[in-house]
From Swiss-Prot:
Keywords: Coiled coil, Endoplasmic reticulum, ER-Golgi transport, Golgi apparatus, Membrane, Protein transport, Transmembrane, Transmembrane helix, Transport. It comes from Mus musculus. One of its GO terms (molecular function) is protein domain specific binding. Syntaxin that may be involved in targeting and fusion of Golgi-derived retrograde transport vesicles with the ER. Residues 33-50, 166-182, 193-207 have a biased composition (Basic and acidic residues). Residues 183-192 have a biased composition (Polar residues). This is Syntaxin-18. InterPro entries: Syntaxin-18_N, Syntaxin/epimorphin_CS.
Amino acid sequence: MAVDITLLFRASVKTVKTRNKALGVAVGGGADGSRDELFRRSPRPKGDFSSRAREVISHIGKLRDFLLEHRKEYINAYSHTMSDYGRMTDTERDQIDQDAQIFIRTCSEAIHQLRTEAHKEIHSQQVKEHRTAVLDFVDDYLKRVCKLYSEQRAIRVKRVVDKKRLSKLEPEPHTKRKDSTSEKAPQNASQDSEGKPAAEELPEKPLAESQPELGTWGDGKGEDELSPEEIQMFEQENQRLIGEMNSLFDEVRQIEGKVVEISRLQEIFTEKVLQQETEIDSIHQLVVGATENIKEGNEDIREAIKNNAGFRVWILFFLVMCSFSLLFLDWYDS
């Protein structure tokens, strides 16, 4: 005879709900809540490799954003003509260069350390391939940021060279001539002011006394005029200065080309260094694998030597027993 235990089941469910409420456990209000309770899983633990890789990518992204944010101020060689707001000095640019190089070197060392630790840890082949792909992506991201920095630095150096070239080509201001003219003007004004009262007080001054003054003025005018020898000397000096400026201009152009070439070679050198670092890591892994293979080969050789020694003992034992058997049979037959 079947027994109806529906009331007992409802009482049990009510007891479980009351206990869960007392313990502070969330209870689903229906099918969805029960499904959430059944299929709820603990969060997947994140490994140290993922967090460190994200940290390196975040640092590289910050460096890229910083370079792009200060790109205009960094490559502007004429910042002294701007206002104080947004102006960047050469010392700040040098500090940016130094910090960027240290930052790139630190990120490269961090990638190398992550690659070494990833190869040392024991994981499945799929995990190893995944980590290798992640490190290759981070390495490529760092190379692109290095290329951006190298281009900015090359542009800055080129503009600095252009600025120096233009500053050398500017004519020198004739300050001495202006000073001499400015000094002569007050003297002439003072002489005129003193000459007028004298002329008014002595209107009947003889003409002979005024002739020396005219003679001195005429002599001064003659001194201002240049002789043909002086004109020729100044022309030769101008030709010499023009030749020097042309030679300086050619030297500046050569230096500019060399600086651009050095920047390009530096970019290639950075890429080659990163490639060599990857090749060194692969060679290290091959050396480690070869060492393990050599150890396994030595163990196999030792085991083979032991097996050969035991085999020789059994052969000797068999030969000795055969010899004794033949001697026994010969004795027994006789």
